């Protein structure tokens, strides 16, 4: 039932995903203990997250092992574990060359993504992430010619319609290109999401 469409859902990796009745925004907060967010909510310093919790949906996802960005994010976006999607870590050892190879190429992702499945079924999909290495996997098989968008704040100054489905992102967001290792890199993602 891979990628099958029904009137109310899509199927991917043996899971049915209901067709949303209104636009859906997914924010993945990666790399932090949920206790930090919970404390911020108690302290009242995260009003927008509090609104997500109150008016929408929130969950703490079970992490995969090893606990690295690439395998966890690909598990979220494919709805499947590393044994299915193929991204088992941030690097793998090439048996022929003996080199460590970073696992960020979309060709290494063995599963379709939920994003591409919904886009193929007619939904308009926007994928924005901080770092471009992740953007390439998140945007795998996403048809940018049909109004879908996939870009990173890291390369927001380089976006083209052909590669990202959007251009002039810095102008749209109204912020300068953030430094790669700054908190503004993630803030840019959220600001871009609001503008789109």
Give the ranges of each region predicted by the language model:
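Generic alpha-helix structural propensity
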Residues: 32, 44-47, 68-72, 82-83, ...
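A general structural signal for short secondary-structure junctions and capping/turn motifs
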Residues: 16-18, 50, 66-67, 115-120, ...
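Short, structured active-site-proximal loop/turn typified by the sulfatase FGly-forming signature C/S-X-P-X-R
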Residues: 37-79, 124-126
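Generic alpha-helical secondary structure signal
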Residues: 5, 35, 43, 47, ...
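Glycine-rich, histidine-containing beta strand-loop boundary motifs that form or position
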Residues: 29, 63, 127-131
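His/Asp/Glu-rich, glycine-adjacent segments
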Residues: 79-196
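Glycine-/proline-rich flexible loop or hinge segments
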Residues: 31-35, 54-60, 69-72, 90-103
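Active-site-proximal N-terminal segment of extracellular/periplasmic enzymes that hydrolyze or transfer
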Residues: 3-57
